[in-house]
Every structure is written in structure tokens, then in C-alpha cells.
Amino acid sequence: MYDISGWKHVFKLDPNKELSDEHLEMICESGTDAVIVGGSDGVTIDNVLHMLVSIRRYAVPCVLEVSDVEAITPGFDFYYIPSVLNSRKVEWVTGVHHEALKEFGDIMDWDEIFMEGYCVLNPEAKVAQLTDAKCDVTEDDVIAYARLADKLLRLPIFYLEYSGTYGDVELVKNVKAELKQAKLYYGGGISNAEQAKEMAQYADTVVVGNIIYDDIKAALKTVKAVKGE
């Protein structure tokens, strides 16, 4: 079993986007700590299974970030369950989770499942619009969400999600200073090694996603920038 607490760099692959076999091999052999499969829309059991089978040809740990209960399948090493803490809709905080537990609770392997406390901070992002996230928040608000995840809910992961835009480094630094047990994941807008390295100063885990589809070489350079290997 892998130890997610030591992961510094992960790639996130969207099953609804095209990725060549050659580029997938580059991602999986890059030295990244894990590959997360997940997206905000167009996620189906078929494209998740296709992605799983493709990634399983390699030794890299593989995580399904669950956005649709209908697209859950066995075979992943871990399952990340996002709870959007700044959503205005309860369904994205605990609602869909309750439904999933009602349907699948008896067969879940709890050692493979980790809850993520999301704070979505880009109002233009698909995930923000889907979940009706309250993105016009102050730093104090974000710190409070971090405390909620870390100290009240005792979640293993607090995820700052800028999704498509590069975030506020000072805010990431201040959030990290508040967390005692939760690991801080940062995702959003990383387009080069310098940005990845900058966020890695404070985030426990840097998530690199969109740049994979725009500039594979730049994406691959983020691994060494974060891990320093």
C-alpha cells in the first residue's frame, strides 16, 4: 500500500480529454508520485475505465477522484471524495456523499478512501459553476475553511483549487501555516516549472493538470521542479 502523505507532485488527468498513448506513457514514467483521474464534466464509466486500463500498464499509483457516483469502478489504488466546503449547495458538501454511502457503503474499503475538503477560488472554473461555489471570499474566510477541514472535520486533505488560473502564493503560505494534520493540496494554473516550484514551497502536494494537454514538455518539467530529484 502506498503512503499518500509523502506525495509531493501528482498529475491530474481528465477522462473527458484526449491524451495520446505516447503522452500518457511520459506522464506515468515521469517520476510523479501519483496520477489522479478526475474532471468536472463528461466523466463516464466508459472513459474512466479506459483511463484506468491505460494507466495500469505502468507502476505509478492511480487515484480516482469521484465526481459522479455512476463512474465509480474498482481497480484504483485510492478513491478521493471531494467535499466543496465553500459550495452554496449542500449536495456538494455532504449530499452526494450520503447517497453514495447509502448505495455502496457496505462494500467500501475504507483504507482506500480519503475525503478532500475543497475550497474553490476561481469563479470562472467549471467546478465553481457546477457546485455554485462562493469564490468572492477573503483570506480570513479561506483560513476558516482550512480550520474547518483540519480541526473540526479532521479531513486528511485540504485542497485549494484555482482550476485554470494561478493562485495567490501568499494565501497558500498562510493556509499551510494553519494546518496541523491535513495535507495541503494546491491545484490551478501551473504552466511551467517555476510556478510549480514556487507553490511547492508551501503546498504539501502540487497538482498539475491542464498544462498536460497544452504543453507536455512543460508539464513534465514540473516533476523535477517540485521533487528536486
UniProtKB/Swiss-Prot annotation:
GO terms for biological process: glycerophospholipid biosynthetic process. The keyword Metal-binding applies. Signal peptide: none annotated. InterPro entries: GGGP/HepGP_synthase_I, GGGP/HepGP_synthase_sf, GGGP_HepGP_synthase. CDD domains: PcrB_like (cd02812). Its EC number is 2.5.1.n9. Its cofactor is Mg(2+). One of its GO terms (molecular function) is magnesium ion binding. Sn-glycerol 1-phosphate binds at K12, Y159, L160, E161, Y162, S163, G164, G189, G209, N210. It holds the Pfam family PcrB. It catalyses: sn-glycerol 1-phosphate + all-trans-heptaprenyl diphosphate = 3-heptaprenyl-sn-glycero-1-phosphate + diphosphate. Mg(2+) binds at D14, S40. Pathway: Membrane lipid metabolism; glycerophospholipid metabolism. Keywords: Lipid biosynthesis, Lipid metabolism, Magnesium, Metal-binding, Phospholipid biosynthesis, Phospholipid metabolism, Transferase. Belongs to the GGGP/HepGP synthase family. Group I subfamily. This is Heptaprenylglyceryl phosphate synthase. The gene is pcrB.
